[in-house]
Amino acid sequence: PEMSRGLGDVYKRQTLYNYRMPEPHRSTIDYHLYNSNEYVIFNPDIRYVDGYPGESCYNCLMPGITMMIAKGYIDEKGIGAQGHSWGGYQVAYLATRTNLFSAIESGAPVVNMFSAYGGIRWGSGMARSFQYEHTQSRLGATPWSSPLRYLENSPLFTMDKVQTPILIMHNDADGHVPWYQGIEYFVAMKRLGKPCWLLNY
């Protein structure tokens, strides 16, 4: 039988018992649409090591994809990845670590943890530093105490390694992920001559 294409949808931890209605979603792929068009959807659970969120994603995702290729479930020449917000960051990081994907859609990603750390959430005015030190990003330190940790986890500084075409989707009214992160991503990719598109939605 002909192999299917694969699409990874990356965020954090998922649940086996969560049914997604066949309807448009605001920031994730339509599983039913892709599956009915012969895509295998891989939605991995990411187990994080504090201080290494990007590498944690890579270490959880890649063995699963490698296994699906080895078992003939997916065609290694037809694999894409999608993520939004935290997932957008993770697929941006993945693009700097592997050329396995044929295309990546990175929605509302953070690519520079230094500049994002110093920002605020526009709607509330809350400083964004908390999420880099203690919550979602799990860096466990400030950029002054552990600058290398921020550097290693910021895709912006290793974009010269990217070979995958990337679609960046962002929103200039996003109150959570700074719009300028999408701009930094796009400008860096274009400056490096990488295939990249930016949609402001």
Where are these regions (language model features)?
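Single conserved hydrophobic/aromatic residue that forms the stacking wall/gate
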Residues: 1-11
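Active-site-proximal cap/loop segments of hydrolase catalytic domains
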Residues: 9, 14-201
